[in-house]
């Protein structure tokens, strides 16, 4: 979630209230995420193959991508709160299913290394995206709007790539 950079982006629209709105929106995100993670986990546990996790992962990515595409069009604080709530829902779909799929495909003798690689990749990717996002936000709103929309499409494409897991016939997670 790019809350700090999005907050800077929205500061020209919301003025002095921006910091408060970022706090409310962040709360909306985490409350929504907290409310949906367990029910989504229960749904994915009821079906004993990975097709549901892959579908939930794709839908979560799609929802999260749409949120980033819509952020540049925010004109009112309630829209920001709603979008962050929707992102929380999408994130809960994404994280539950991704973690379950990832864990089921790890080499059991090298789980620590597998998780280490995953977290290293995620940390570097977040650092690079933050750096690029910060740079583009310094160029003005139009450049940052393009970045947000591009991030949205990249997340949706990531969801499509994750759906391609279904094409792998001998995947370990097939019967989880």
Where in the sequence are the language-model features?
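Helix-loop boundary and gating motifs at the non-cytosolic
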Residues: 1-30
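Loop-to-transmembrane helix entry/capping segments in MFS-fold secondary transporters
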Residues: 19-20, 108-118
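Central cavity-lining transmembrane alpha-helices of secondary-active solute carriers
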Residues: 24-42
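Helix-to-loop junctions at the C-terminal end of transmembrane segments
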Residues: 38-51, 137
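Structural signature of the two symmetry-related core transmembrane helices
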Residues: 53-69
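Hydrophobic core of transmembrane alpha-helices in multi-pass small-molecule transporters
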Residues: 78-94
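Intracellular juxtamembrane helix-capping segments at the cytosolic ends
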Residues: 93-106
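A membrane-interface helix-boundary motif in multi-pass transporters
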Residues: 135-155
């Amino acid at each position: 979630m790019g809350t700090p950079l999005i907050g800077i982006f929205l500061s020209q629209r919301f003025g002095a209230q921006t910091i408060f709105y970022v706090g409310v929106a962040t709360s909306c995100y985490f409350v929504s995420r907290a409310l949906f993670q367990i029910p989504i986990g229960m749904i994915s546990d009821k079906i004993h193959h990975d097709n549901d996790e892959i579908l939930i992962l794709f839908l979560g990515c799609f929802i999260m991508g749409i949120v980033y595409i819509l952020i540049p069009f925010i004109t009112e604080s309630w829209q920001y709160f709603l979008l962050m709530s929707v992102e929380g829902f999408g994130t809960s779909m994404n994280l539950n299913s991704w973690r379950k799929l990832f864990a089921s495909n790890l080499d059991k003798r090298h789980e620590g290394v597998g998780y280490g690689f995953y977290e290293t990749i995620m940390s570097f990717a977040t650092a690079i995206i933050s750096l690029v996002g910060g740079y583009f936000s310094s160029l003005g709103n139009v450049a940052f709007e393009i970045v947000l929309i591009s991030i949205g499409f990249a997340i949706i494409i990531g969801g499509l790539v994750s759906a391609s897991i279904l094409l792998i016939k001998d995947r370990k997670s097939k019967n989880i």
